[in-house]
Amino acid sequence: KAKPKNLEKLKKFPITVLVCGNDKINIKNLLKILKQKKIKNILLEGGGITNWTFVKENLVDDIIITVTPYLVGGNTATTLVDGTGFSKIIGSTKLKLKNVRKVKNEITLHYECV
């Protein structure tokens, strides 16, 4: 949930802020509003919960993952997808590797959801 003080800070920028839901994002309402505004593509840079919400609703076309040379983790580390997840691999989203790119000391993997 966006804090009111953070929403207030955004007012100084030439952007439109969409509030879609009370305590969490109402994805279907958000996509309906974006469609009305003729927006057909979005870049989702969410946390694990937001990412999982879009994946479980089959709303993701591509996934781009950057592998960096840092080891982080632990019990409270952010994950790519959070929430209930898929109980079995057979039911999970299938990915097809489209591209691999190396930039300096990082590797970017571009997958298509099939």
PLM region descriptions:
Residues K1-L43, G47-V114:
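Enzymes that bind and transform nitrogen-containing heteroaromatic metabolites
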